């Protein structure tokens, strides 16, 4: 199977809904100061790389997002944004297999299956 490099907006929303019971990477970053102060009092240090988090979900850190991209969070500083490409659901290159049910069927990345 071809390695896919595009992540769709609805796919990310689906991923978020599956993980909303626990903190996502960006929620953890937002609440990082509370965790760091607690960790320091215990002698532990938490490091978080927004750039690594952005690239881990297929995004790119840059100053401005293109028209075909949307911003998720900031990268290393407030002027640098994590931009993720919004894919075209009609493009078969943006489809993923329904491997979770053990079939060979394919469906668009951004569908609600």
From Swiss-Prot:
Q: Which GO terms describe its cellular component?
A: extracellular region
State if Signal is listed as a keyword: yes
Keyword vocabulary terms for this entry: Antibiotic, Antimicrobial, Defensin, Disulfide bond, Secreted, Signal
What are the disulfide bonds? 54-82, 61-75, 65-83
Chief location of this protein?
secreted
- A Pfam short name: Defensin_beta_2
Under the heading InterPro entries, the entry gives: Beta_defensin_dom
Q: Name one GO biological process term.
A: defense response to bacterium
Subcellular localization(s) per the UniProt record:
Secreted
Q: Which domain of life is it from?
A: Eukaryota
Tell me its family. Belongs to the beta-defensin family.
Q: Which residues form a coiled coil?
A: none
Q: What does this protein do?
A: Has antibacterial activity.
Under which name does UniProt file this protein?
Beta-defensin 112
């Amino acid at each position: 199977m071809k390695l896919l490099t595009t992540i769709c907006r609805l796919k990310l929303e689906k991923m978020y809904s599956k993980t909303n019971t626990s903190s996502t990477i960006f929620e953890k970053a937002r609440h990082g100061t509370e965790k760091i102060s607690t960790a320091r009092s215990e002698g532990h240090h938490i490091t978080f790389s927004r750039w690594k988090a952005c690239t881990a979900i297929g995004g790119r850190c840059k100053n401005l997002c293109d028209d075909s991209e949307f911003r998720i969070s900031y990268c290393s500083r407030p002027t640098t944004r994590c931009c993720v490409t919004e894919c075209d659901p009609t493009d078969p290159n943006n489809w993923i297999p329904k491997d979770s049910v053990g079939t060979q069927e394919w469906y668009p990345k951004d569908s609600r299956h």
